[in-house]
Amino acid sequence: NNMDKIICSNIWKIFGNDEKRILDNLDPNLSRDEVQEKTGHVVAVKDVSFSIQKGETFVVMGLSGSGKSTLVRCLTRLIEPTSGSVIIDDTDITKISRNSLLDLRRNKMSMVFQHFGLFPHRTVLENISYGLEIRGEKKQDRLDKATESLNLVGLKGWHNNYPRELSGGMQQRVGLARAMAVEPEILIFDEPFSALDPLIRREMQDELLDIQKKLQRTMVFITHDFLEAIKMGDHIAIMKDGEISQVG
């Protein structure tokens, strides 16, 4: 289907020092705990397949330890899958070189984590333009894009402030603006709002839904919160013990 932006096929991730061999000899009847007991290896992601259409928000929901954060890091190869393929725009990224991968991360995808990872000694605007700087864009272009991004997330007037002067919710807006500034085709969110208090969390959800209406990016959104999943997702994959039990 030419609408598919991301196709994951049979993704496995096993943690341990001999992951390939363990996978090749895996007894399918053993539970995760039994595998760990017998082999000292942890099956974090178990034979997961799904596809994500261009412009949709695909939510992966599960409790902590379900493998959802590991899975999403396999999409960018921050964690190398033990086996399986991740096809983004017809390219299997598990097969590309380190340089192509960095290029892809720089130009095509952005990640937003729960911990904002802002630079304390940079202003809000400088934080937002960081990705553009790495990419080597001209200063004026950087400022223009960063300012646009800043306004998009409702931080107009805060560009010269420093992260410590902002509340948690506002810091998360800066993180969101930074991800948006590079105009990525794919945005990956790992529990971005779960550290915020409920009211601000709802505000941020609404904000992201508005932004998504305007920009129609492809989004992968991880959460443990059922209500958040329903609110944010076009499709929801439920993950448990490293497997996706259903996609709705």
Named regions from a protein language model:
Residues D24-E34, T91-D92, S129, E133-G136, ...:
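Conserved ABC ATPase "signature" region
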Residues V35-G40, T94-S110, I134, K139-Q140:
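ABC ATPase NBD coupling module
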Residues T76:
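Helix-to-loop junction immediately C-terminal to a conserved catalytic motif
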Residues G84-D92:
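Conserved ABC transporter NBD signature motif
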Residues Y162-L166, M170:
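Conserved ABC ATPase signature
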Residues A181-E185:
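A short, proline-enriched helix->beta-strand linker immediately N-terminal to the Walker B motif
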Residues V247-G248:
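ABC ATPase "signature
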